[in-house]
Amino acid sequence: MIPIQWKQNDKKTMHVNEAENGVVYLTWPAIEKIEGIRHAFSTRIGGVSKEHLSSMNLSFSRGDDPANVRENYRRFCEAAGFEVENIVTSDQAHTTKVRYVTKADCGSGVTRDRDFHDIDGMITDEPGVVLATFYADCVPLYFVDPVHRAIGLSHSGWRGTVHKMGQATLDAMHERFGTEAKDVIAAVGPSICQECYEVSGDVIEEFRAAFPETLHEKLFCGKPDGKYKLNLWEANHQILLAAGVPEKQIHLPNLCTCCNPDFLYSHRASKGKRGNLAAFLSLV
């Protein structure tokens, strides 16, 4: 197993699972405890893709041989307990658009073409539908409403975060299912940490405008060269708190993609030569 660098105090916040077929994937202890939920977050380990895509690339848009990507999906689903034909993938464009998906959408982006575009978040209350979103530094957001038996999964880069994708997903779940934030178990998945995430002043100005001044010190810090270090984990944490999700029901990753480039794909660490990780969430 490749050594994993956890962040604060080397605290292992996620379970590292190694399947019999060699696939390694991550799960949240808090979500594992919820009856009728299956979830996972992929790593680079256990696939067939080569070179900078090695080996569990789950994207058809990174220049990989499509046959390799299909085999990776087969292996991953065998390991984590999903059905390939039931996966519905997002079409990410750094929006805050959230789509309600059903069994009619199953296979979208994997076994057949999608019939929707520019969707960064998905919600469902239909068992068997497997939501899947893609990453290589951006933030995965998992939402489970055990009261209404509903789930949501969203992609939130800095643009999605500054426009509060977490709030948008909770709003969509409330409108569709009656979800109350106080009932939701939420998780911020593996993504780039503040130490690794340098951004320009233009980005920080958007965060200054979007978040109360009392939070600025928690969210970003300046560098002597005029750049800033941005904390997407804390920004999404604060968005979820402000939306009404209780502190004890919000789970942060403590695992940085950029700090672990041999274990997880990172756009920053690889200078763009990388595959894609994926988050998965379904009702069973």
Regions found by a protein language model. Name each.
Residues M1-V284:
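Active-site microenvironment for binding and transforming phosphate-containing groups
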